[in-house]
Amino acid sequence: MRGKAKKGKYVAIEGIDTTGKSTQIALLRERYKNALFTKEPSEGDFGATIRNLALHGDLSNLTQCMLFLADRANHTQTLIAPNANRLIISDRSLISGVAYADSLDFELSLQINRAVAKIPDLAVILETNEAILKARLAQKENDNIESRGIAYLLEVQERIIKSAKSLGIKTLRIPCDKPKEEILEIICAEIDSGESLNLCESSESNECESYKSRDSH
């Protein structure tokens, strides 16, 4: 029976905007009613201010990175760590923090984020492509990040994938154009699995799961 994941798993739902993260988070809330749901930036006053500045303000990328990092450290200490024995499902994590911090050296960003944040046991990355992204962006008003263009967003997607691998996180990559119910079942099957989720021991490990690659066989 689905929706009964074992305690003590930290799952990050990742992907650039328009990939359906919010839809999956809403569906997961219905499935895992006792889980702790959270997001980055965090939902407190500080996190809300940072989110608004990132989407609509004119701060430099480096300044935004430092603010996000401070929020991530506080979020980890006050919410993630104290609830380590629960199923935690987060809309974004340090993976996005590293991926969007393009003004910082990649390895430096990895080191800093490792120092202040908990590493997810599982990263679910909802992936898009140029055609899908172009169509979905045309249907909405774009914020500061989305206004940087399709090429930039696809570069961020590649950095999300690279960040998860470099952090040694087991990763489930799913094409975002699959039916939302199918995506949900794929995610739940992985959350409910009895195996240890953190299987990738190094950046060279090939053990990260990919629904995309399995589907192509």
Regions found by a protein language model. Give the residues of each.
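P-loop (Walker A) phosphate-binding loop of NTP-binding proteins
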Residues: I16
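ATP-dependent small-molecule kinase phosphotransfer cores
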Residues: L36-R114
